[in-house]
Amino acid sequence: MCCNYYGNSCGYGSGCGCGYGSGSGCGCGYGTGYGCGYGCGFGSHYGCGYGTGYGCGYGSGSGYCGYRPFCFRRCYSSC
């Protein structure tokens, strides 16, 4: 499981989850502790950031945008 509470990382600058250029997963971006971040995306399947299919941030397909608590919950439920 890519996105978790244990600090596992598969992207740079992320505390947990998937980061820059990841294939799938959700989690953290640049400098975030957990949840939805800014740099999680660029082709990630579930995540946050630019061009994501589901999640939060700029250009998300399903409209779960912004820096709201729902954004965090969505990322974990997506995983």
UniProtKB/Swiss-Prot annotation:
The keyword Ribonucleoprotein does not apply. Interacts with hair keratins. The keyword Repeat applies. The gene is KRTAP21-1. It comes from the Eukaryota. This is Keratin-associated protein 21-1. In the hair cortex, hair keratin intermediate filaments are embedded in an interfilamentous matrix, consisting of hair keratin-associated proteins (KRTAP), which are essential for the formation of a rigid and resistant hair shaft through their extensive disulfide bond cross-linking with abundant cysteine residues of hair keratins. The matrix proteins include the high-sulfur and high-glycine-tyrosine keratins. One of its GO terms (cellular component) is intermediate filament. Keywords: Keratin, Repeat.
